[in-house]
Amino acid sequence: MATVPGQLIWEIVKNNNCFLVKQFGRGNSKVQFSKETNNLTNVHSYKHSGLANKKTVTIQAADKDQAVVLATTKTKKQNKPKLSVNKSILKKEFPRMSKAVANQVVDNYYRPDLKKAALARLSAISKGLRVAKSGAKQRNRQA
């Protein structure tokens, strides 16, 4: 079975797809965002598109406590969507998680151009999962 090239897929879906969100920016300029699951930066572009690229990276909050899911797509299983995703759950502290994401994305030559975006998404998600500490109890100093 022959696969369709990513450039052709992008040319077909770039102007009209269900994930496209168009908003007006400053003045009259239009800003386009994307709600794709495999898009790290949510920017509507070929580089970040999860539809057009064979290799994609996704970082999401897990359902359970303080965990983050790092998902990458396998290039060999493109015709079987359920089997094409490789998920790993990260439960460690932030420095170890960031090292694991960097190793997975960059050091394995998977998508080194997405390192900065992946670490930014990981940072935002881990900040959102962090539980705020309760303040120190105020003592009554009147004696």
Curated annotation (Swiss-Prot):
Expression across tissues: Expressed in seedlings, roots, stems, leaves, inflorescences and siliques.
Domain of life: Eukaryota
Listed GO CC annotations: chloroplast; cytoplasm; cytosolic large ribosomal subunit; cytosolic ribosome; mitochondrion; nucleolus; nucleoplasm; nucleus
One biological process term in Gene Ontology: adaxial/abaxial pattern specification
Localization annotation: Cytoplasm; Nucleus; Nucleus, Nucleolus; Nucleus, Nucleoplasm
InterPro entries on file: Ribosomal_eL28, Ribosomal_eL28/Mak16
Pfam families xref list: Ribosomal_L28e
Record carries keyword Transcription regulation: no
Alphabetized UniProt keyword annotations: Cytoplasm, Nucleus, Ribonucleoprotein, Ribosomal protein
Single GO MF annotation: mRNA binding
Keyword Cytoplasm tagged: yes
Main location: cytoplasm
Disulfide bonds: none
Effect of deleting the gene: Pale green leaves and slightly longer early appearing leaves. Delayed leaf growth and abnormal leaf patterning, with the abaxial mesophyll features appearing in the adaxial mesophyll domain. More proximal vein branching in the petiole and reduced number of small veins at later leaf developmental stages. Abnormal inflorescences terminating early and producing several secondary inflorescences. Double mutant ae5-1 as2-101 exhibits an increased number of lotus- and needle-like leaves. The double mutant ae5 as1/2 produces severe abaxialized leaves.
Biological role: Component of the large ribosomal subunit. Essential in leaf polarity establishment, probably having a role for translation in leaf dorsoventral patterning to specify leaf adaxial identity.
Subunit structure, interactors included: Component of the large ribosomal subunit.
Family designation: Belongs to the eukaryotic ribosomal protein eL28 family.
PANTHER family: 60S RIBOSOMAL PROTEIN L28
Listed name of the protein: Large ribosomal subunit protein eL28z
Species of provenance: Arabidopsis thaliana
